[in-house]
Amino acid sequence: MDLGEIEKDFTKIDEYFFDACNIKSYNYNGTYYCCKNISSTHFTKLMYLIINEKNSTNGHQKIIKYLKKKINVKNPSRINRQNDEGWTALMIASITCGQWCSIETVRLLLEHGANPNIQEKNGLQLSGIKSQLAHIISLICKTMRQKNSNPENGFTALSLACAVLDTGESVEVVELLLKYGTNVDSINHNGETALIITCQNSKYFHSIFVIDLLLQNNANTLHKDNNGFTALIHAVSHCPLNIVKLLVKNGSDVNATDNEGKSVLMHSTKNSIDIVKYLLKKGAEINHKNNNDINVLFFASKNHVKSDVIMFLLAKCSNPNEINTNKNAVLAHVCRQFNHHKNDIDTVKILLENRANPNIIDDDSRTILMDICTDYQNENSLDIIEMLLKKGANVNATDIEGRTALNYACMSINNKITIKIIKLLLKYNINVNHVDNDGAHILIDLCRNYSRYSLKVVKLLLEHGADVNITFGNKKWTPLFFANENLFSSSEKDPERCTKLIDLLIHYGANVNAVGKYGNNILMEDTTRNLECPNSITKHLLEKKINVNHQNDNGDTSLLLVYERHELERAYSIAQFLLEHGCNPNIINKNEHNILTILNNDIFWNFEKVIPHFKLFLNYNFNPNIYQIYGCHFILINVLLI
């Protein structure tokens, strides 16, 4: 926001405040504004006259007349009375000069003994500010944040004047206050002096004149605020070079550090390369490290600084692969940013061109590529991944869990960016048949953790030669088993999506009659679950010619397993479904067990409930003459033949 816009906005807000608050009769218990956003009660009459000076006829003359009253002449200390917020008349005049009152009023107060060193005691607060005023209040926001607030140290008239340097009157106010003996190094709640406050607001044209005034009056350039920031640290972050030069010329320490050990040089990287070069010329230590053992190159990389600064620092810091205590090289540090900034792409490019190692790993043997594929996926990530791969990043590197970048990308499928990342990894020939330390194939992971975008990725992997019949775990399940299980294990229960995955696997050669560890096929797994069966997936598998009479290692069929695992009521509908699709009710397993032997107890104790089952079997070529159980054979035959 330029000066013209600021003045225009102040004019609008002046009208708002005067109309809303200030043009009303004086009342000691009334509420009035000390400045644009701070209100208080218990205003003195002098304060009231000051805030209304420019909005009333002969406003300044009214102030002169008031100060000449006998009560004020006999009691000169009355001029320093404070309102409920701890503000004096001089404070109010200093911060509103040029807007609500005149520079002559500030001078008049000082001539009548106003004390420029009184500090407000309640602390400046920003609560209750109207939203339409926020862009104006930002002029003084930095000086009002209350950190480690101490009621003994508040803002003085000088620090308030330095908080708003948008007009020429602000400079005159500072000059007057200094002339009348204000303490140039008085500190506020945040440990900030007038010099520090001015450097925070130094984007305004008049700031350099005020800084020069403060320095001429021996302002302490080495003082640190509560965060350990000196005026120079604040200045190098955003001020123009001429202000930085002025501070250094007047004794500022170019190697000062804040509470986190960050140096002036580190903070300067966020500004411009000219300031970085100037500080180094003046003796700034380039090899300094902060409390986290991070050097200036690390710090600059972390803060998305411009590429010209990175390039310059690389020329000064010869080893871009230097490791800090967290074993993060500069390259890894940049690539592991949560949200990749456009400047990060330029930084990565520069680092790689200057011999940075794209295969550096952390304590878990994770590469930069793995980390980006896991947590830091956005459009800029694609550019960074391709740069790493072009510069020799090992696409098939594994971590301590035996996982590759492709494993991690497939674990994090949540948007279209992931699909693009996987395509990029495939372009650089990542191994689609890699198996991790647990024996899990990527295709297995995708099928057992099926999500919205999984189908596209599975198709990509199959197109690039992924083994569709790979097995995993003690059960020796193939991807088809896991795809089928999704209907039962997924909270979404989406049969249509599961069907699409099953069809895709079968299209690329999945064996529909594959068996697990004990010889069970998928149909057996489905029919023996304590869940809804038959279901759309089971029916679909039968359409795909799964063997309904397949026998497992024990010789059991799906029909035999149904009666081994389920109650009679539950078994009937499943048995009917299997028989309708060609299941043979006469098969005997390796233990010489058949349907009658399995239903042995039910024949004796639930005979009436068994009858419907055997009638069902008879409809599907059941041969009762081959069975005989403890003398019940003839009774059963007679019943069934009735």
UniProtKB/Swiss-Prot annotation:
Assigned keywords, A-Z: ANK repeat, Repeat
InterPro entries assigned: Ankyrin_rpt, Ankyrin_rpt-contain_sf
Pfam families documented for this protein: Ank_2
Top-level taxon of origin: Viruses
Keyword match Transferase: no
Renumbered ranges of ANK repeats: 42-76, 85-118, 153-186, 190-224, 227-256, 260-288, 292-322, 326-360, 365-397, 401-434, 438-470, 475-514, 518-550, 554-587
Protein name: Putative ankyrin repeat protein L91
Lineage: Viruses, Varidnaviria, Bamfordvirae, Nucleocytoviricota, Megaviricetes
